[in-house]
Amino acid sequence: MSEEKCSLTGGEEKGEELARSLAWQHLVKQAEEDDDDDEEALKKEEEEEEEEEEEDEEEEEEGPDSSSDDLSPEAPCMHPDLLELAVDREKCRSIRRQYRQLIYTVQQNREDIVNTASDSLTEALEEANVLFDGVSRTREAALDAQFLVLASDLGKEKAKQLNSDMSFFNHVAFCELLLVFVGLNWMEEECEELSECDESIALSFWNMLHKEATAWMLQAETFHFIFGSFKAERSARKPRQEHHKRACKMEGNGDMPTKLRKLDVHANQETTEKEVERILGLLQTYFQKYPDTPVSYFEFVIDPNSFSRTVENIFYVSFIIRDGFARIRLDQDRLPILEPTNVNQVDEENDSCSYCRKQGVISLSLQDWKNIVSTFEISEAMIKNSY
């Protein structure tokens, strides 16, 4: 059994080694194919350039022969149209050559353009814009479109680098910016390190940097603690006072709410009685002055200037009618009127005919009050305010 296990493990190791070797061979082969593809592409571009140059040369050679009929045999120079055509071809050939050189340069410096913060891509785009001003044929426009596709890919990669490396700090670039800021960028041509320079240069560098940093520090606001520099201690919770202690204290002072409430009710009763007596005196005065003429109930209780005062008058008059000092009845127009009563009649009714009394409820809204004032033309209240 042990021999079989050893043979199995040995077979597995050989299989893994064989798989690794095959994978490595595949990677090497793929890399070689990529190199071959790049070489073939460059060769194709060179062949296209050579073919274009040969075609242009053939056209230039055929040009004078074809125009020999138009020119005189004594004319030693080329026709102006043919000369202009040759100049245009040379210009287009130069533009194509510059486009191919620009594309090749950008492809070679692809990693530097993407991984660094240089303006190489911007400069290449500006150069392409200058070349595009002279483009007049589709072949040059196709090269311009090819360059734009390449530039857009590089811009997309730079954008990804920007999003992923936002927190990355490039100390080399920071040092270069500091040297440019203090005016020591010329030191790169004279010496490689700052330690090799004179002490005066280093001192001036730090003095200028200190001056700029101090100016920024003066603009920053100072930080203040709300509780000061000491550590705030948590205040102890006060014990809750019991309710019975507060009640005992109130009894000792004699300020009892119940007594105050009783005094208030008694005072209100006295006020109501005084107001009822005052209105009764006004009603009796009217009856003495006009003994045979009853007074209109609405004209007596309505106050044309105050709805609330009218309600109070109705309330007080109800006590007068309840106690029998006046009575209310309806006249011929079915309107309520007030009539006086005799004292003897009041005593008799209290003794024997108290069961004949009737009670009624009067409903008066704000609109009803306004209608009564306008209908009865009440301009002045019969019950004057006592205050």
Swiss-Prot record:
Localization, per the record, is:
Nucleus; Cytoplasm; Chromosome, Telomere
In the UniProt record, which is one GO cellular component term? nucleus
A Pfam family per the record: Nse4_C
Listed GO biological process terms: DNA recombination; DNA repair
Disordered: region residues: 1-77
UniProt entry keywords in alphabetical sequence: Chromosome, Cytoplasm, DNA damage, DNA recombination, DNA repair, Nucleus, Repressor, Telomere, Transcription, Transcription regulation
Ranges of compositional bias, category Basic and acidic residues: 1-19
Main location per UniProt?
Answer: nucleus
Q: Where is the composition biased (Acidic residues)?
A: 32-72
What biological function has been recorded for the protein in this entry? Answer: Tissue-specific component of the SMC5-SMC6 complex, a complex involved in repair of DNA double-strand breaks by homologous recombination. The complex may promote sister chromatid homologous recombination by recruiting the SMC1-SMC3 cohesin complex to double-strand breaks. The complex is required for telomere maintenance via recombination and mediates sumoylation of shelterin complex (telosome) components.
The record's comment on protein family reads: Belongs to the NSE4 family.
Q: How does it assemble?
A: Component of the SMC5-SMC6 complex which consists at least of SMC5, SMC6, NSMCE2, NSMCE1, NSMCE4A or EID3 and NSMCE3. NSMCE1, NSMCE4A or EID3 and NSMCE3 probably form a subcomplex that bridges the head domains of the SMC5:SMC6 heterodimer. Homodimer, and heterodimer with EID2. Interacts with the C-terminal region of CREBBP.
What's the protein name?
EP300-interacting inhibitor of differentiation 3
Q: Which organism is it from?
A: Rattus norvegicus (Rat)
